[in-house]
Design a protein with these regions (language model features):
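Conserved catalytic cores of very large enzyme subunits
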Residues: 1-252
Length: 252
């Protein structure tokens, strides 16, 4: 029955063109990890889902496993066995890192342990979050801003100078995105909180996302418990490789 459920997840019935060609609904399944009671949540269904993914080798529903320092070795081995087939059928979260990041950001521990991913892989607290992001490419910043499109009019005395310039350009790009995000707000209320610009009503989401009713605000006007806007960096691996190559070939 569960295998048939996964197969149904691959059936697309659409009335128009789709902007994305990656063939996923973004309805994610999260396995294992620390439960709200503080205990490991791995169970028989965890392994059953992994068996299905291995046998069917399909991408829907996207499945991620939460791993931590106390993850059973049996589960670690099983996850590796499924991943080796490729296709990105199973992703993993380093749960210890994610929980530390969330609590450092201000989430209560009891909320942080409930984390799941949204449509892609960004973590959030399900049922309580309005999440959005602005994507940007770190490699483009290195190429176009720091190295000025390789125009020959840029020079650095050391790799540290180059890296400092890149870090400054990266920070500048984030500040520009922050300015864009500020456009979502009409200003501050008397109590100092931000007031969102008026948005079209979204009754269904507002009914199901926690605290929209309590706050008397639409989901798109700040009604959810957590309203998150984030810079979404891409090209990290290419950027790191490029910086390393420059350091080795030019400065070392």
């Amino acid at each position: 029955i569960l295998a048939h459920f996964f197969i149904k997840g691959c059936e697309w019935v659409k009335g128009g063109n789709c902007y994305s060609g990656d063939g996923q609904h973004y309805q994610n399944i999260l396995l294992a990890g620390i439960g709200e009671d503080g205990n490991e949540a791995t169970n028989e269904v965890t392994y059953l889902v992994l068996d299905i993914l291995e046998e069917l080798n399909i991408g829907d529903f996207p499945t991620t496993v939460r791993l931590n320092r106390n993850t059973p070795e049996k589960l670690l081995r099983r996850v590796c066995e499924v991943i080796r087939y490729g296709g990105g059928a199973v992703a993993v979260y380093c749960e210890d890192v994610v929980l530390r990041a969330l609590t450092d950001f201000g989430y209560p521990r009891e909320e942080a342990v409930r984390f799941a991913n949204d449509g892609c892989w960004e973590v959030q607290i399900p049922g309580k979050t309005n999440f959005g992001y602005l994507p940007f490419d770190a490699l483009q910043i290195l190429q176009h801003r720091t190295l000025r499109d390789y125009g020959g009019d840029v020079a650095f005395a050391s790799f540290d100078d180059l890296y400092a310039a890149f870090a400054g350009d990266l920070a500048g790009a984030v500040r520009e995105m922050a300015d864009v995000l500020c456009g979502e707000f009409a200003g501050r209320r008397a109590d100092g909180t931000w007031q969102w610009n008026p948005k079209p009503p979204c009754t269904v989401i507002s009914l199901f996302e926690e605290d929209c009713i309590g706050r008397g605000l639409s989901y798109y006007e700040g009604g959810a418990v957590y309203n998150i806007r984030s810079p979404h960096i891409g090209g990290i691996a290419d950027t790191v490789n490029s910086l390393y190559a420059i350091r080795k070939l030019v400065f070392d």
